[in-house]
Amino acid sequence: MKVGVVGASGYVGGETLRLLVNHPDVEIAAVTSRQHVGEYLHRVQPSLRGFTDLTFSELDYDRLSDSCDLVFTAVPHGTATDIVRALYDRDIKVIDLSADYRLHDPADYTKWYGWEHPHPDYLSKSVFGIPELHREEIRSAKLVSCPGCMAVTSILALAPPVREGLVDTEHIVVDSKIGSSGAGAGAGTAHAMRAGVIRPYKPAKHRHTGEIEQELSGIAGKKIRVSMSPHAVDVVRGILCTNHVFLTREASEKDLWKMYRQAYGEERFVRLIRDKKGLYKFPDPKFLVGSNFCDIGFDLDEDNNRLVAISASDNLMKGAAGSAIQNMNIMAGLDEMSGLRYTPLTPV
């Protein structure tokens, strides 16, 4: 299978390339960048040194159409709209890693991103790329939009209790912690100011809230509101979501475990975590770095009828490039784990 990557100079594009160069069923046919035309990939993504001699090329739709079966777009939010449409119209399968086709309602782009979507009629053509929820739609899709990193991590934890009708849909709270790579590859604040922080950002209006509301509303069959507050923490990779929901009826720990096992027992990239002893009783992103797993656990606050669903992932893997490769495998009829058989790195 021949693939292309549009916009491969950032963290997400680089991680996508790292997975593709090791994928047994893939040949990278083209990699584009506006800034680095003619440069070797490893000059911009040094981890690829010795794995490929490819150079960055200009964005040429005809070349991509002639040489690629599928193209990944890993460009900044707001810049993928025209690129994705042009590829789609040339009958190329597309996996978009930006936010530009995640939301189905054009009004949500005005609400969450502050701009009108230029191609609203294409939003309905996109499948939201969480395989654990939309595998069959992904299998036949021509355009898949990968979810935001905090969105997918939270949605996977919340989907089962919402589906079971266990949740007070008026009071869902998502508390997220995310590493610095989630902010992108641009030069940022000095290390002296970033190190050691636990810093709230966009505590009331983070954009991923819209994705969580969209997916949970679809599962519940009614409009759901989510209160989400993310925090930047002093790690490079990793997301931890502590999701608080209040139960509408009594449920025991045994009931909840059965619910999660029924939802994810056969899923190869979701692991259920809750040990009675030791240090690792709940999901911890430290033990997911470099892997495509999302770990899910929970605790039950019986006094307040509150379920605390805890989920963790690597924001560049299950939260971005790993999900993209998983979606590609499904679209191409490949083994879903192909190119993704990585155990987490530890220690890091």
From Swiss-Prot:
Protein name (Swiss-Prot/TrEMBL): Putative [LysW]-L-2-aminoadipate/[LysW]-L-glutamate phosphate reductase
Keywords attached to this entry: Amino-acid biosynthesis, Arginine biosynthesis, Cytoplasm, Lysine biosynthesis, NADP, Oxidoreductase
Active-site residue numbers: C149
Family assignment from sequence similarity: Belongs to the NAGSA dehydrogenase family. Type 1 subfamily. LysY sub-subfamily.
Main function: Involved in both the arginine and lysine biosynthetic pathways.
EC number(s) per entry: 1.2.1.103, 1.2.1.106
Enzyme class, first EC level, given as a word: oxidoreductase
Record gene name: lysY
